[in-house]
Structure formats: C-alpha cells, structure tokens
Design a protein with these regions (language model features):
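Catalytic centers of hydrolytic enzymes
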Residues: 1-149
Length: 149
C-alpha cells in the first residue's frame, strides 16, 4: 500500500522530486502479517469508505493502491458483501492463512490488524530509489488488482 499524492509520472527519468510527490513524508517501511480474513475485512472497509451509498459515509474517495493480489468486487453490493473473490498470485486467498504484508503508515494497515508489526529503518524514498536502480526503465502496465464484476 502506498500514498496517492502527485500527478502521474510521464515516461522518462524519474526524479527525486517525483518520488517526494508520490510519498512526501518519507515514512519508514513497515511490515505486518495479515490473516486472510483481515485482508478481506480491510478491503471491505476501504470499499465502503469509497463507494458508500450515503455520501456522508464516504472518506478518502479512492480505492487503496495495492500490489500482489487480485480482488473481484461488486461495487453496487451492500457493505460487507462487495468482495467476491481474492487471489494471491494464482491461488485463492485462504481466510485462515497469514500473509506477509508491506506498507507505509497506519493509513495502509490500521493498528487493529495483523501480528508481528515491525517498523524498519529503511525509509520509503530510499526503498523507491533502490527499486528504480534495479528495475529501470519501468513499465507501468495495468495489473487488474481490483476488477469490478
């Protein structure tokens, strides 16, 4: 999970300014183990805050950016019934299994979720710079993380 600030980055060199536009406060990288049912609960919570029928219940206005899973959702369904199926890689999410998760700030994973929460010394900007040095040039393809069905 990451932040949503800044405009999309156009193809070409990614600058330090671009990185700070993505995640301006440069928080530390955190990890936590989430059980499958917590992942579904978090997704349902986020979808309700995004697509609530009552506009006064809407908060944030976006579905969190995520990577590493695919969720098939019915936006029009009532709260708690939007997530239809989740896959981690090619495997269906197992509600009783723990999954290692990486995030930044409690906006990514609220403190009520998970076990073995750790805040690491590496900070977000340094992690992004390391990633870019390994995987440039980048290709940003749609991954179908959230699919409305």
């Amino acid at each position: 999970n990451g932040w949503r600030y800044g405009a999309p980055i156009i193809p070409g060199e990614v600058t330090l300014n671009d990185l700070y536009n993505i995640i301006p406060m440069n928080p530390p990288i955190s990890t936590v183990e989430l059980i499958g049912e917590e992942i579904v609960a978090m997704l349902e919570e986020n979808l309700e805050r995004t697509f609530a029928r009552d506009p006064y219940d809407q908060m944030g206005g976006y579905v969190k950016r995520s990577l590493g899973f695919n969720a098939y959702i019915k936006i029009e369904n009532p709260p708690g019934q939007r997530v239809q199926e989740v896959f981690v890689g090619d495997e269906p999410l197992q509600t009783g299994r723990y999954y290692p998760t990486t995030f930044v700030t409690e906006q990514g994973v609220a403190g009520k979720y998970g076990r073995n929460r750790r805040h690491h010394t590496e900070r977000s900007i340094e992690a992004l710079k390391t990633y870019l040095s390994r995987y440039s040039p980048l290709r940003a393809e749609l991954r179908g993380t959230f699919v409305a069905v």
